[in-house]
């Protein structure tokens, strides 16, 4: 009888714990996100993440995310996207043609999640290790028919009323321009920016600043040290007191660069660097409780696989099938209020709506366009050709 009473008491305690946990989960899922940290590992799919785990022998921050989904990355024009079309889809509701930035296939400008949330009163920021005018960051603020219009993109960035801070490289598009425009001078004297060339000099009380810390892209991870995680922490300190919350986009830009070169050592350095940046974001979100963190990629680069060439299942190597992009899906990882929306299979142009909805806001955009009718045409043609050989 006594044993039965103890078991009954234990059952009540366990049931109470399960109910409390369930209520906590429901409360977290019903809460609205005040802040959003949107992180993009350029060129990063599951092979890159798992390769970093294997080679480092360490757990990755990615493993801490409670919600994971699969993202289809094809563009409006191709089964394999470039970073311009991929970035535009992640930033807006629109798939566009490769090389196009911030516009749909008909060259009509589209509204990005950064712009939409800024219009709702949120502060915004961008942190990258590429040019600040490179395809992925530019997809959040620029509207140009071709991604290589760097000087035009720089002007659009300078004149953008929605960006409160931006950190990265690419000073040559501002200060060494073909049109001889002193864009830095104009930014500081006419457009309200404070421009730094060193992250350590930043005054986080400034309401609008740019850190353009290199003439070109930032150096490789092995040479730039902890620039990216420090930049994320600096941005978070700046945005922390935003009255209506904030939106921060962070890109691990050079994972893609390394995979284009099939350089595994460089790729590993960039993956670990990006993981440290993700940790900084996740730590902030766990402390605040009102911050949604979404981590994904624009595409996979390199066709990375992890085989054993000997077929003995003992010696894993990094093996690349291309020096370019692939059509492999990528993953999306989510934590915080609204994170449960980021599960299952989705298109890359669905993430903006999920973020807006997580913030308790109606998605301010056109309806999501239908899938291109000729999807996988090139793949099917290749399969048909191979079957005839």
Which residues does each predicted region cover?
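Bacterial N-terminal signal peptides that target proteins for export
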Residues: 1-9
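C-terminal motif of bacterial Sec signal peptides marking the signal peptidase cleavage site
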Residues: 17-20
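N-terminal catalytic scaffold of extracellular/periplasmic and nuclease hydrolases
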Residues: 22-177, 183-201, 300-389
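Metal-dependent active-site segment of extracytoplasmic phospho-/sulfohydrolases and closely related
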Residues: 46, 272-311
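Active-site His/acidic residue clusters
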Residues: 135-141, 215-220, 232-236, 240-245, ...
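A Trp-anchored, charged/polar loop motif used as the substrate-binding/catalytic surface
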Residues: 193-196, 225-240
């Amino acid at each position: 009888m006594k044993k039965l009473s103890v078991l009954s008491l234990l059952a009540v305690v366990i049931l109470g714990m399960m109910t409390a946990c369930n209520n906590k989960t429901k409360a977290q899922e019903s809460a609205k996100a005040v802040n959003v940290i949107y992180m993009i590992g350029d060129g990063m799919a599951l092979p890159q993440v798992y390769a970093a785990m294997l080679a480092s022998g360490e757990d990755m921050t990615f493993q801490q995310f409670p919600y994971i989904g699969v993202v289809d990355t094809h563009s409006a024009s191709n089964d394999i996207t470039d970073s311009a079309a991929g970035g535009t889809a992640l930033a807006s509701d629109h798939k566009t043609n490769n090389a196009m930035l911030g516009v749909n296939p008909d060259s009509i400008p589209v509204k990005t999640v950064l712009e939409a949330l800024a219009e709702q009163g949120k502060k915004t920021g961008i942190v990258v290790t590429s040019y600040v005018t490179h395809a992925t960051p530019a997809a959040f603020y620029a509207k140009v028919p071709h991604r290589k219009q760097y000087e035009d993109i720089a002007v659009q960035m300078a004149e953008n009323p929605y960006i409160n801070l931006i950190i990265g490289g690419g000073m040559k598009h501002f200060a060494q321009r073909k049109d001889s425009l002193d864009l830095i001078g104009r930014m500081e004297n006419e457009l309200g920016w404070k421009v730094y060339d060193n992250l350590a000099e930043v005054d986080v009380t400034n309401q609008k600043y740019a850190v353009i810390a290199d003439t070109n892209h930032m150096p490789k991870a092995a040479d730039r040290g902890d620039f990216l995680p420090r930049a994320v922490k600096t941005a978070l300190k700046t945005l922390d007191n935003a009255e209506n919350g904030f939106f921060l986009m962070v890109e691990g830009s050079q994972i893609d660069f390394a995979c284009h070169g099939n350089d595994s050592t460089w790729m590993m350095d960039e993956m670990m660097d990006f993981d440290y940046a993700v940790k900084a974001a996740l730590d902030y979100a766990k402390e605040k409780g009102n911050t949604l963190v979404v981590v994904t990629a624009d595409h996979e680069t390199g066709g990375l696989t992890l085989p054993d060439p000997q077929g003995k299942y003992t010696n894993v190597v990094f093996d690349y099938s291309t020096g370019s992009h692939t059509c492999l899906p990528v993953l999306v990882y989510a934590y915080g209020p609204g994170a449960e929306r980021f599960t299952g299979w989705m298109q890359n142009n669905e993430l903006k709506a999920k973020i807006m909805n997580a913030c308790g806001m109606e998605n301010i955009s056109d309806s999501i366009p239908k899938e291109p009718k000729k999807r996988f045409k090139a793949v099917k043609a290749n399969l048909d050709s191979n079957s005839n050989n």
